[in-house]
Swiss-Prot record:
Organism listed in the record: Gallus gallus
GO-annotated biological processes: cell division; DNA repair; replication fork processing; resolution of meiotic recombination intermediates
Subunit structure and binding partners: Heterodimer with CENPX, sometimes called MHF; this interaction stabilizes both partners. MHF heterodimers can assemble to form tetrameric structures. MHF also coassemble with CENPT-CENPW heterodimers at centromeres to form the tetrameric CENP-T-W-S-X complex. Forms a discrete complex with FANCM and CENPX, called FANCM-MHF; this interaction, probably mediated by direct binding between CENPS and FANCM, leads to synergistic activation of double-stranded DNA binding and strongly stimulates FANCM-mediated DNA remodeling.
Pfam families in the cross-refs: CENP-S
Record's GO cellular component terms: FANCM-MHF complex; kinetochore
Similarity comment text for this entry: Belongs to the TAF9 family. CENP-S/MHF1 subfamily.
Subcellular location(s) of the protein: Nucleus; Chromosome, Centromere; Chromosome, Centromere, Kinetochore
Positions of region (Disordered): 99-139
Protein name in the entry: Centromere protein S
Amino acid sequence: MEAAGGEQRELLIQRLRAAVHYTTGCLCQDVAEDKGVLFSKQTVAAISEITFRQCENFARDLEMFARHAKRSTITSEDVKLLARRSNSLLKYITQKSDELASSNMEQKEKKKKKSSAAKGRKTEENETPVTESEDSNMA
């Protein structure tokens, strides 16, 4: 049973490597067209291998940051910690994180308004309407 799981894992890793290699090739083609330079197949392969290994390191670091904080979920704070050595990347990630946080707050507020409006309608529906005869007794 473990052998099948290991084979499945290796298959997924190979697919991921292929996807990274393909994406690297596409990016190299774009740069080649833009800058008028050529990339050999060996160069593309080397860049994709370095990229894949760096992604593995990032994944391990993110897992360790979360584990150190006694969490099982990686948060945006972990990603910011990972990007701390690159000021421009950290600035970009912080900006996007703030945008996501404000967007999430807006969505929560909309949900609250919708639910409170729905509750208000339900209480209005539950109240019995006052008829004129009952109203005249009050006077």
